[in-house]
Regions:
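Anion-binding alpha/beta catalytic cores of soluble intermediary-metabolism enzymes, centered on
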Residues: 1-47, 51-234, 239-305
């Protein structure tokens, strides 16, 4: 179990440093996060973008960046393409999106000729440190699939389970969230949640326990589940919340950050490597946390949770 991002940092710090390819690295928060992780011995980096700006921002942050670690790219498209090439060439282990549109880097990732897609849907996982909750909490998918059907939700679950296995969890606990716990043909997400549970029981997602349909309060609070007579191994212990739509996930994550003071990491999974993907306006801390997650997923020491 990972209780918080400090726990995660400890695991990353005990592993061999990985290399991140940063597309459009000429951004203060992005570069600050990368440089801090590098100074701590957590990772190495290759910075792609406007070379002069990257070196200048580095100096502003008090760091003289070695020009040998910088690759100039005149456009966002060039930066994304070069970053993906570094993954294919084995020179980098994972990607980070810098000061560019999300669509630009994803277009390079899924390019059928030159990309790093693996022929299955990609999805986003927000990993949150929420005050009052005993461990890190995943929320998926609040960033990639707007209204997934059952097959889309299966891909989302599969990606999330693989991510948590890579983070060291032997048997992650998932809750397929709905407004209520009963299956109703009129509420399609309850039907899908029940189908996901059956798929998990059949071993479709690998080793995990998935409950659904289940409401948010029961997923996160064992006492609420006890009062309502809802018995499941996940109540009060959920590792991953599977939301019914991108909007639901996006709103939930932002509410936890704004009102509960949650800390976040954002990762896209389902390609040949994880992608640290945050809003361009995301804080230094969020981008740093995302690097930690990707570094551990990229081959750090694994431990049972």
């Amino acid at each position: 179990m990972l209780h918080n991002f400090e726990d995660l940092r400890g695991r990353v710090g005990s592993a061999e440093p990985k290399t991140v390819a940063v597309a459009c690295a000429h951004d203060g928060h992005t570069l600050e996060a990368v440089l801090r992780a590098a100074q701590e011995g957590i990772l190495r980096y290759i910075l792609i973008g406007h070379a002069d700006e990257i070196l200048s921002v580095g100096r502003t942050l008090g760091c003289e960046i070695d020009p040998a670690t910088v690759i100039n790219a005149d456009t966002d498209e060039d930066a994304a393409r070069i970053a993906v090439e570094l993954i294919l060439d084995g020179r980098a282990d994972f990607l980070q999106k810098g000061l560019m549109q999300t669509a630009t880097i994803l277009k390079a990732v899924v390019n059928k000729q030159t990309g790093i897609g693996i022929g299955r849907p990609m999805s986003h996982v927000a990993l949150l440190e929420v005050p009052g909750y005993a461990k890190l909490l995943g929320v998926t998918d609040g960033g990639m699939m707007p209204n997934p059907d059952l097959e889309g939700k299966k891909a989302i679950v599969r990606n999330a389970v693989e991510m948590f296995h890579a983070l060291g969890y032997e048997e992650p606990l998932l809750s397929a969230l709905c407004a209520a716990e009963n299956v109703s043909p009129k509420i399609i997400e309850t039907v899908d949640a029940a189908a996901l549970k059956q798929a998990a029981l059949g071993g479709e997602f690998g080793r995990c326990i998935l409950e659904g349909p289940i409401s948010l309060d029961l997923a996160l609070d064992a006492e609420s589940a006890k009062i309502k007579g809802y018995e499941s191994p996940v109540t009060g212990k959920t590792d991953i919340l599977v939301v019914p739509s991108m909007s639901a996930g996006n709103i939930m994550v932002k509410a936890l950050i704004e009102f509960a003071g949650a800390k976040m990491a954002g990762v896209v999974i389902g390609a040949k490597c994880p992608i640290a993907l945050n809003s361009r306006s995301a804080s230094f801390e969020e981008k740093y946390n995302s690097l930690l997650v990707c570094a551990l997923m990229s081959g750090g020491k694994r431990a049972g949770a």
